[in-house]
Amino acid sequence: MKWKKSLTGLSSYKPGKREEEVMAELGLTEITKLSSNENPLGTSPKVAAMQANSCVETEIYPDGWASSLRKEVAAFYQLEEEELIFTAGVDELIELLTRVLLDNTTNTVMATPTFVQYRQNALIEGAEVKEIPLLADGEHNLEGMLDAIDEKTTIVWICNPNNPTGNYIELADIQAFLDKVPSDVLVVLDEAYIEYVTPQPEKHEKLIRTYKNVIITRTFSKIYGLASARVGYGIADKEIINQLNIVRPPFNTTSIGQKLAIEAIKDQAFIEACRTSNANGIKQYEAFAKRFEQVKLYPANGNFVLIDLGIEAGTIFSYLEKNGYITRSGAALGFPTAVRITIGKEEENSAVIALLEKLL
């Protein structure tokens, strides 16, 4: 086959092991998955009720415009419906963005380490990837990113809060950055974890009215607990949305996914409960880190913590796995002596912390 040359050296995404697989390998009867930043509280009771009672005509294609969901999200953020695009998770939106803006004559600027799909999709399109190392505390080096922009740059990526460090960039700093970015360079503000920031920041959505070169990406996979439904969305100026719709598959979000997302966004009381539970979980890990000088906890603003224990990441990962907890090794994320742990329920956090204390 005459594969694209840009695929040379790339590999497919490797998801973590399934719980059943780990239990069989290690002879465990119970295991807790804290590796994929899923919501430990599940999803809204309203979503559960819709799921139980929903009758979806599986032989009929879904609404390709996601009309009802579009109306709900537009009303929630006080946006125009044409300022939204819905995709099969943010992953698909990232793919669409690289497809319309990147090729082998362009480059893209991003932090490192950050969400791996920016780099992967850019390389598939043949673009040059300019990676700017994070600062020592895990913050984006915004000045370094600005310096990397040149006449061939078409996309700049900012994951906020950043995955895997959890650092959050304040709105004023984002605006100061955007003021310096050329107007023909698209800035992607990936806010998959924004709902977890405590206290909730000033709304970012209206940035698109001031900066026509910005798209904000959001998801129903994290705090809304709809990871398997695969519903993500972008907020941007109509011109950006129109260009993305040219390459968007016609029926890319499912009927059931659209219905569940509508119920999910209606139940903000559940979202607030999740945010509070998550904030309390972060405090548990902060208290743990203060007890040990050798432990570095990166600023946590998502639903996960990145903890550097000064011990080889694979050792930490295997130790926790053998004791019934699947986490994410920092070795694959650019942090060779750290692990990323999804914030769980209070008792799950306590159990993991107790294990880490024994390891230290």
From Swiss-Prot:
Cofactor(s) needed for function: pyridoxal 5'-phosphate
Keywords: Amino-acid biosynthesis, Aminotransferase, Histidine biosynthesis, Pyridoxal phosphate, Transferase
Modified residues (N6-(pyridoxal phosphate)lysine): 222
An annotated GO BP: L-histidine biosynthetic process
Gene Ontology terms, MF aspect: histidinol-phosphate transaminase activity; pyridoxal phosphate binding
Keyword Transferase attributed: yes
SUPFAM superfamilies (UniProt xref): PLP-dependent transferases
Pathway: Amino-acid biosynthesis; L-histidine biosynthesis; L-histidine from 5-phospho-alpha-D-ribose 1-diphosphate: step 7/9
Top-level taxon in the UniProt lineage: Bacteria
InterPro entries from the UniProt entry: Aminotransferase_I/II_large, HisP_aminotrans, HistidinolP_aminotransfase, PyrdxlP-dep_Trfase, PyrdxlP-dep_Trfase_major, PyrdxlP-dep_Trfase_small
Membrane-crossing residue ranges in chain numbering: none
Enzyme Commission number(s) of this protein: 2.6.1.9
Pfam families referenced in this protein's UniProt entry, alphabetically: Aminotran_1_2 (PF00155)
Catalytic activity from the UniProt record: L-histidinol phosphate + 2-oxoglutarate = 3-(imidazol-4-yl)-2-oxopropyl phosphate + L-glutamate
Assembly and binders: Homodimer.
Family membership noted in the UniProt record: Belongs to the class-II pyridoxal-phosphate-dependent aminotransferase family. Histidinol-phosphate aminotransferase subfamily.
HAMAP family named among the record's database cross-references: HisC_aminotrans_2
Protein name: Histidinol-phosphate aminotransferase
Gene that encodes the chain: hisC
